[in-house]
Every structure is written in structure tokens, then in C-alpha cells.
């Protein structure tokens, strides 16, 4: 999925 450094807010 998203990169490990991404915030949960960014994932959404």
C-alpha cells in the first residue's frame, strides 16, 4: 500500500 513513512491521514 502506502509508504511506511506516510501518516494515517495521508493514507486516507
Swiss-Prot record:
Function description: Hemocyanins are copper-containing oxygen carriers occurring freely dissolved in the hemolymph of many mollusks and arthropods.
Signal peptide range in chain numbering: none
One Gene Ontology CC term in the entry: extracellular space
Organism encoding this protein: Necora puber
Subcellular location as annotated: Secreted, Extracellular space
Superkingdom as given in the UniProt entry: Eukaryota
Free-text tissue specificity from the UniProt record: Hemolymph.
GO function terms (MF aspect): oxygen carrier activity
Family in the record: Belongs to the tyrosinase family. Hemocyanin subfamily.
Record protein name field: Hemocyanin subunit 1
Main location: secreted
Keyword field: Copper, Oxygen transport, Secreted, Transport
